[in-house]
C-alpha cells in the first residue's frame, strides 16, 4: 500500500470484520470502515451507509484517498424494493438484477466489479493480516482411509453445487452426506448435523468431518469461508473428527483460540 493512500473495509460490522478493522487501524491510521448493515455502529473512522447509497460511498472513498478495498463482514442480500436513485447507482441496476437471477455469489461479484470500474482495487484480507490464515505447519497432513473418503466426497459435492451458487459447507460421516449448508449458515448446519447423527445412531462414534471450501468460480476477494473457535466447539458437540478446509482461501477468526481447541 502506498503511504499516502488508505484502506477501506466494506461490509457488515461483525466480530471478524471488527477485529480486522482494529488491527489495520493500529498499523494504518487512515483505515476506514463502511458498515452496510442496517444496525448503526459508532467508532472512529466508521461510516454507516445503505448499500444503495453508492454515490455517497464513492465520494467518501475518493475524499479519504482510498485505493484498496477489503470486502469483509456479513451483509443481508440487498432488497431492491429499497432502491432509490442517487445519480450513480441506477446505472448498475440492470447488472444487479441479472446477477440476482444467478445467486448471491453473482450479486457479490457484481458489487466488486462496480468498485473496480471506479478505479478501486479489491484486496484480500490476507494481504494485510497473516493471522487470518493457517500455515502448512498448523494442519494435519495424514488422514485415515475412511477420513479421506468423507473429505473427498464432500469436496466433490461442493464443487458440483458450485454451479448453483449454493453451499460452502458439508458434513459427511462414515460415507454418508449428513447435511449441506443452506441459508442458515455453518453454526446451524452443525447443530442440525448433531441431531441427525443422533437420529442415524451415529452419535456414539466419533467420525466424519465438516468440509468448507469456496465455490469453484468464486471471487477470492469476497464471501470467503470463515471458521473460528465456535466452529471447533460445535464440531466437537456433533462428535465429528474434525474440520477440512482450503487454508489458502479460508479466514480464521481468533486464530490463537482456534488452534488451542
Question: What does each of the following model-derived ranges do?
Answer:
Residues 13-17, 101-105, 119-236:
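Conserved mixed alpha/beta catalytic, RNA-binding, or beta-rich assembly cores of soluble enzyme
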Residues 2-36:
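N-terminal basic/disordered segments at the start of proteins
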Residues 57-127:
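N-terminal glycine-rich phosphate/adenylate-binding segment common to multiple enzyme folds
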Residues 9-11, 32-35, 69-72, 122-127, ...:
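General beta-strand structural signal in soluble alpha/beta enzymes
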Residues 11-16, 74-78, 105, 250:
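Gly/Ser/Thr-rich loops at beta-strand to alpha-helix junctions
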Residues 36-42, 46-66, 84-96, 103, ...:
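Feature captures the catalytic cores and cofactor-binding loops of soluble hydro-lyases/lyases
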Residues 18-21, 183, 255-256:
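Conserved strand-to-helix beginnings and helix N-cap segments that scaffold or border functional pockets
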Residues 2-6, 27-30, 42, 64-67, ...:
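Short coil/turn connectors at secondary-structure junctions
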Amino acid at each position: 500500500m502506498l503511504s499516502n493512500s488508505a484502506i477501506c473495509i466494506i461490509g457488515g460490522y461483525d466480530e471478524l470484520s471488527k477485529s480486522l478493522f482494529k488491527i489495520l487501524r493500529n498499523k494504518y491510521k487512515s483505515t476506514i470502515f463502511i458498515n452496510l448493515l442496517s444496525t448503526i455502529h459508532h467508532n472512529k473512522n466508521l461510516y454507516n451507509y445503505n448499500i444503495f447509497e453508492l454515490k455517497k460511498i464513492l465520494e467518501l472513498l475518493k475524499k479519504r484517498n482510498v485505493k484498496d478495498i477489503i470486502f469483509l463482514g456479513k451483509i443481508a442480500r440487498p432488497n431492491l424494493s429499497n432502491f432509490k436513485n442517487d445519480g450513480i447507482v441506477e446505472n448498475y441496476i440492470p447488472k444487479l438484477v441479472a446477477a440476482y437471477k444467478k445467486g448471491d455469489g453473482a450479486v457479490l461479484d457484481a458489487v466488486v466489479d462496480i468498485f473496480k470500474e471506479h478505479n478501486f482495487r479489491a484486496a484480500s484480507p490476507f494481504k494485510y493480516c497473516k493471522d487470518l490464515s493457517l500455515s502448512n505447519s498448523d494442519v494435519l497432513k495424514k488422514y485415515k482411509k475412511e477420513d479421506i473418503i468423507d473429505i473427498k466426497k464432500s469436496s466433490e459435492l461442493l464443487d458440483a453445487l458450485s454451479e448453483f451458487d449454493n453451499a460452502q459447507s458439508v458434513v459427511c460421516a462414515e460415507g454418508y452426506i449428513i447435511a449441506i449448508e443452506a441459508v442458515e449458515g455453518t453454526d446451524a448446519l452443525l447443530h442440525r448435523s448433531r441431531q441427525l447423527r443422533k437420529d442415524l445412531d451415529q452419535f456414539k462414534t466419533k467420525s466424519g468431518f465438516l468440509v468448507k471450501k469456496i465455490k469453484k468460480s468464486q471471487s477470492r476477494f469476497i464471501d470467503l469461508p470463515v471458521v473460528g473457535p465456535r466452529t471447533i466447539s460445535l464440531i466437537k458437540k456433533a462428535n465429528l473428527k474434525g474440520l477440512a478446509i482450503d487454508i489458502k482461501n479460508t479466514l480464521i477468526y481468533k486464530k490463537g483460540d482456534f488452534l488451542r481447541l
